Amino acid sequence: MSSIRYHSSAFDDGSFSVMARNLENMVNRANAQYVKIDKHREPYTVHYNALRDKVYSEWKESGVLGTLLKGSTLCGGYGDKLKVSMPDEFDLLIHLVFPENDKIIVKADASKKGNVILDMTKVMEIIGSQEHNKPVFDLLQKIVNKKKQLLEDKLNSLLQSIMTQTLNKMGNQIEVAGRISHLEYKKCGPAHTIFVKGPCEYSVDFVPAIRLSAAQVVLAPEQRRHFGGTLYWDAIPKPMKPAKTDNASFRASFYEAERSLLLGKQSLKPAIRLLKQNRNVKNKANLKSYHIKTLFLWQVVQQDASYWSNSPKDIFIEMLGKLADSLALTPKKGKLPFFWDPKLDMFAELTDSQRTDLFNHFRKCEYTFRKDNGNVNDCTENNVHSSFSINTR
């Protein structure tokens, strides 16, 4: 499918072409006014960079763990250039690499779709006799189970202690450009989150990630093709819900591969930003950013490359419909398969009432935009404004 076509007799004879362009102009103006973060980007980025460098350097000096740190990757909405409204959330993968890291035996977790188990047996056999790696071996002894499987909760407990020590050393504050900002630390899922209060107010999720090579990937053949020539992927110590003691299950994360898949698709990212902004404005927090990203990842592999040359407005409208279909409970229950393991339905965790609320909103939004796309009227500008602006008229 290379182009999006709306079935309307008015459209077929071209009589409403000017009106259609007017809706597009309205959406483009809303994008420039409410969605883009360009005017706020520099001060927040400067502040974030200072905090990132300080925390990373403190982690680097934190004994054995510091020897495992091998750089970081800005990910999430900001890293993907999908952040909307304000640059007030940053997601940072902190890469951990063990000695003999390529000897980690990775297995799919049969009891948790989308997760993997990291068997450290061969790693520990090799480094156990190496004097220079004795500190790492001793650390591993504390964070693996009897089967030598790495434990999420033990690793996170260690990192939580290190982050607490880091903030204490910093006095729970940081000075940037002569101004003091106060810092608060909370453990949020897999992330070690710092909330910044000061001239720039934002949060940073420091997410630990065991960096693994392409040779260690455990994917079905089709998903392996989507992984392509990507060199690395990560295993994230994401706690179970409810929390589980001695948890050997890690969430597989393919951020680098996803970034490659989203790259160079003309209107893809603008359309994602429109959908995220609408979600934010309407307070539909049960729809996560990764849900939206996943919806588009599936379209990347299903649509012809020329599809993304359609306008962001047209793609946005079509994705509203696909999202609503995925959320529907009747007549057939929809689903949003995890891109890297389609057996996992990412909407399965939502209650029926949450799904119904999201479905009703996005189906109504789709209807409104499709109607306005074929018949711009006095209400159209207000509809566009209310869809993307937190300020009411």
Swiss-Prot record:
Positions annotated to bind GTP: D205, R251, A252, S253, F254, Y255, E256, A257, E258
Catalyzed reaction equations: GTP + ATP = 3',2'-cGAMP + 2 diphosphate; GTP + ATP = pppA(2'-5')pG + diphosphate; pppA(2'-5')pG = 3',2'-cGAMP + diphosphate
Domain of life according to the entry: Eukaryota
EC top class, as a word: transferase
Molecular function (Gene Ontology), one example: 2',3'-cyclic GMP-AMP synthase activity
Keyword Transferase on entry: yes
EC number, as in UniProt: 2.7.7.-
Keywords (A to Z) from UniProt: Antiviral defense, ATP-binding, GTP-binding, Immunity, Innate immunity, Magnesium, Manganese, Metal-binding, Nucleotide-binding, Nucleotidyltransferase, RNA-binding, Transferase
Matches recorded under InterPro entries: Mab-21-like_nuc_Trfase, Mab-21_HhH/H2TH-like, MAB21L/cGLR
The UniProt record lists the keyword Transferase: yes
Cofactor needs: Mg(2+); Mn(2+)
Binding site for Mg(2+): E89, D91, D205
Functional note: Nucleotidyltransferase that catalyzes the formation of cyclic GMP-AMP (3',2'-cGAMP) from ATP and GTP and plays a key role in innate immunity. Synthesizes 3',2'-cGAMP in a two-step reaction through production of the linear intermediate pppA(2'-5')pG. Acts as a key sensor of double-stranded RNA (dsRNA), the presence of dsRNA in the cytoplasm being a danger signal that triggers the immune responses.
Family, as annotated: Belongs to the mab-21 family.
Protein known as: Cyclic GMP-AMP synthase-like receptor 1
Source organism of this protein record: Drosophila simulans
